[in-house]
Amino acid sequence: MRIKLVAVGRLREEAYERACAEYARRLAAYARLELVEVRDARIADSRAGLLKEGQALLDQLHPGEHAVLLDSGGKQFTSVELADWLENHTVQEPVFIVGSSHGVAPMVRERAQMVWSLSKLTFPHELARVIVLEQLYRAVTILAGHPYHHG
C-alpha cells in the first residue's frame, strides 16, 4: 500500500515534528509513505495566497491518485471505518491533503474525490497532520490485526 500526505507549510513546532516523524516511522512498516510539504504563500492577500498554495497542492497530485481533502465539513469515520475504507479503496492510491490555516482554494476542493473530517472540532493544521498520521497508523494496524487499537 502506498499513502501520500501533502500539506501546506513546514511544521514549526518541534513537538508536532517529533510526533509526525514517529507515526511516519511506524507507518513505514505497513505502507510506503510519502510526505510532501508545499510552500505556504505568505501573501497578505489571502485569496491570492490560497490560489498559489492550491496550484502547488494540485501539482503534487498524479493520475491514479485519490485526493482526500481534510476539512471540518467532510465525512467522519471511526477508526475501524477508516481501516475498512483503506482496505477497500485499493484501485487508486490515497493522497491526503492538509491545507493551510486559511483553508484551501476552491480548485483543490473540486479535485478532491473525498472530503474527510477528523472531528467537528477545528484543529491547528499542524496538529491535523499528527492526527492524520496517527489515524492512518491505527487503520493499518487494525487491518494487520496488531493490538495497537483496543476498540
Swiss-Prot record:
<dbReference type="GO" id="GO:0070038">
    <property type="term" value="F:rRNA (pseudouridine-N3-)-methyltransferase activity"/>
</dbReference>
<keyword id="KW-0698">rRNA processing</keyword>
<dbReference type="InterPro" id="IPR029028">
    <property type="entry name" value="Alpha/beta_knot_MTases"/>
</dbReference>
<keyword id="KW-0808">Transferase</keyword>
<feature type="binding site">
    <location>
        <position position="70"/>
    </location>
    <ligand>
        <name>S-adenosyl-L-methionine</name>
    </ligand>
</feature>
<dbReference type="Pfam" id="PF02590">
    <property type="entry name" value="SPOUT_MTase"/>
</dbReference>
<comment type="subunit">
    <text>Homodimer.</text>
</comment>
<dbReference type="InterPro" id="IPR029026">
    <property type="entry name" value="tRNA_m1G_MTases_N"/>
</dbReference>
<keyword id="KW-0963">Cytoplasm</keyword>
<comment type="function">
    <text>Specifically methylates the pseudouridine at position 1915 (m3Psi1915) in 23S rRNA.</text>
</comment>
<keyword id="KW-0949">S-adenosyl-L-methionine</keyword>
<feature type="binding site">
    <location>
        <position position="99"/>
    </location>
    <ligand>
        <name>S-adenosyl-L-methionine</name>
    </ligand>
</feature>
<protein>
    <recommendedName>
        <fullName>Ribosomal RNA large subunit methyltransferase H</fullName>
        <ecNumber>2.1.1.177</ecNumber>
    </recommendedName>
</protein>
<keyword id="KW-0489">Methyltransferase</keyword>
<feature type="binding site">
    <location>
        <begin position="118"/>
        <end position="123"/>
    </location>
    <ligand>
        <name>S-adenosyl-L-methionine</name>
    </ligand>
</feature>
<comment type="similarity">
    <text>Belongs to the RNA methyltransferase RlmH family.</text>
</comment>
<dbReference type="GO" id="GO:0005737">
    <property type="term" value="C:cytoplasm"/>
</dbReference>
<dbReference type="InterPro" id="IPR003742">
    <property type="entry name" value="RlmH-like"/>
</dbReference>
